[in-house]
Amino acid sequence: MKILKKDSHEKFYWLGFLAGDGSVQEQGRRLRIELKNDSLDILNHFKDFMESNANITSRINNNGCHCSKIDINSKELGNYLAEYNIVPNKTKTFEIPEDKIPEEYKMDFIRGFMDADGCIHIRKERNNTPSLSFVSGSKKCIEQIKDILNITNKINQQGNNYLLYKEGKEVITILDKIYEHSTEETRLKRKYDIYCTIIK
C-alpha cells in the first residue's frame, strides 16, 4: 500500500481526507469510506492509490441518499493510521499530528481534510464573494487548521460541531496554497471546479 511507504504530496492528501471521512472499524482492522455518489470519483482515486482490489459498492442510506462505499480490511493499515490519530470514534477527539507532517506536506493534508469536511462557496448575494469553511466535531482540530492557514476569524460552535469560516479576497490566497501541489487524483473535482471559477 502506497500510504505505508515514503512521504509524498499524495500520501498526505489521503491522510487528511481519511482524517475527515475515513471510518476505522472492527478494532482497527477495517477502514471504510462512504460518500454520496457525487463524490464517486474520489473513491476511485483512493482505490487506485491504495492499489486495492476491494469493491466499491452502492446503497441508499437511512436518509435516502445514494451512496458508495469502500471497505479495506487490513490490521497493518489500521495500525499505521493510528499513528496519525485516525482511530475509531475520532470525531470529537481528532488532533492533526503536526509533528508527523513535514511542512512541505501540510497543505496537502489540509486539502484532503477540506475535501472531506470543508466547503468552498461563491456568495452570489455578496457580489460573488468567495468563502471557505471547515467543520469538525473536534475543536482542537479546527484550532489547528485556523493556525496552519493563519486565519484570524473566530471559531463558532454549531451544535456538536465547530466551524471555521472565512470569506473575501484572502480566500483566494489560501486556496492557491492549498491547491498548489494538487493533481486530478488528489482533489475533489466539484470543489476544485468552484475554485477555478473563483480565480477566473
Ranges and model annotations:
Residues 1-200:
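Internal intein/HINT superfamily modules and their associated LAGLIDADG
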